[in-house]
Amino acid sequence: LIHQETLDLLEWPRLCQHLSTFAATKLGTLAAQQLTIPATEADSQQLLVQTQEVYWLDQQGQGLPFGGIRDIGDDLLRAQRQGLLGGDQLLAVASTLHGARQLRRTIDGQSPEDLPVLQALVANLRTYPELEQHIHHCIDDRGDVTDRASPKLATLRDKLKSTRQDIQQRLQRIMQRQAGALQEPLITQRGDRFVLPVKAPQKDAIPGIVHDASASGATLYIEPQAVVSLGNSLRQLQQQEKAEAEVILRQLTEQVAAVAEDLEDLLAVVTELDLASARARYSLWLEANPPRFITADEPITLRQLRHPLLVWQQRHEQGPEVVPINVLMSAQLRVVAITGPNTGGKTVTLKTLGLAVLMAKVGLFVPAREPVELPWIEQVLADIGDEQSIEQSLSTFSGHIRRIGRILAALEQVPPPDTHSPTPPLPHSPTPLLPHSL
């Protein structure tokens, strides 16, 4: 477990925010911003291989396509809870199924030797093309239920069209006969009723139901008695049409609910792929190289290591040129103390090394010259800041003491180099780096 205090001191959340800008989907963006740090070296190694495979794919000009992928997690939950999905939500499901299928085709289209990890990741991905086709059969591009969704719906809509035409024709005839009673020759609507704008003094010329009046009271909007019965029929047909459309939406929602667990797995795979793609693109942008996790008897080698946040600042905010550092440590070293004058780069060096360790753990390449060789470190602990007196800030001072206590407790768990204990040393014991201010 890496404490959030340490991550904040190293400005890890800022790096995650930068990583998220390379994601292609909302799912990937959110996952990058809330990046999980693996608990085992095997998990980190798996993520690194994913990054390398996507990196290779990008270099071949065949990057992963994420078009059409939507965050449908809430829609799946709604369907599982017997809610009703609307047309737009169903289209999002269909679009995501299609997008996931394109992702799988791109990955499966490569040689198994080139993308073994990614192909294993999508091997059990179910994209339900028949569900996608059924949704598009029943829902048009605007999210409305289509006439072809059911024979009953088509019949109701034919009747609706015919009834509207009858109403329009009758109103046209009334307008021709009673033109002098109208404010203007116009058929309009109030609510779901068709009405004519009649001059108030001549309302008796067109008997019917008054549904509205103008602000001045000079115009009354009257539904002529001759079309009231048709208006009632129209309203009934509209209610029947709405009910039938909801039947279609309910059927489609139930089909989505029936496969919701598979679709949740699909979203998880898509998110993992988008994260891998974001890591690869961010690594390429940083001109970084893949790290190799070394054993306890190998030296740490980080040449021309650059602080990733300073690289971002230089390129996006016209910051100063980033000065690279070299970190070369033999396996025999137990502690490294960095000394030097103020503003000499000690803190930046510590933060750069801390971020390099974290980047390797989450499957990112490290912005250093090849070879990039460092141990997989389980615990990363940091206490970075200026000296504080108790009088200046008791809370700040207490915070320093608490963090230093954690570091010392972790150091007590590391066996000395000359131990004769039958228990072997930890395979990746942390090498503390202490700034002179501590």
What are these regions (language model features)?
Residues 80-86, 108-114, 170-185, 278-289, ...:
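Active-site phosphate-binding and catalytic loops of NTP-dependent enzymes
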Residues 127-140, 230-250:
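Extended, charged coiled-coil "arm/hinge" scaffolds of SMC/Rad50-like chromosome-maintenance ATPases
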Residues 154-203, 282, 299:
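Extended, Lys/Arg-enriched charged tracts that mediate electrostatic binding to polyanionic substrates
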Residues 156, 160-163, 237, 241-276:
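Intracellular alpha-helical coupling/juxtamembrane segments of multi-pass membrane proteins
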Residues 254-315:
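Phosphate-binding P-loop/Walker A region and its immediate neighborhood
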Residues 286, 296-438:
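ATPase nucleotide-binding head domains, primarily ABC-like/P-loop NTPase cores
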